[in-house]
Amino acid sequence: YKHGRRIALAPLLARLIAARLPPAMGNRVIVPVPLHRRRIWQRGFNQAALLGRQLHQLGHGPLCVDALVRNRPTPPLGGLGKEARARTLSGAITLRPARVGMIADADVILVDDVLTSGATSTACVKALKRGGAASVTIACFSRVLDEALAR
């Protein structure tokens, strides 16, 4: 999807994600995992934001693409173990101060394409909870099951 630049798959992948989400109720906000601006420039798109836009269009809540900020570029996490991924992401993701009002007391759907070790999701959840999110549900279409990540 992302490495093959097959962005036309976003609607299908979002429908797969949407099928597993609880019905939209109350104060729900869709927030994609952020990429650093350099990575967006290199890739040309944020794959999580594309999925988030599709979830929004499917009626799963408003989309806030800029709620989370990747403060500094991080190297690709592929090949790193769980602890190395967590160290790499430490302090790299924060909540944009201007979006605190939208996140406070909201049920956030955090969107990403793949959940590998959970380090990126954990960093995002911490930032959202610090901003007052009532709950955070992680929504992705794929999960890596690799014992090598446990190292």
Region annotations inferred by a language model:
Residues 1-110, 117-151:
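Conserved PRPP/pyrophosphate-binding segment of the phosphoribosyltransferase/PRPP-pathway fold
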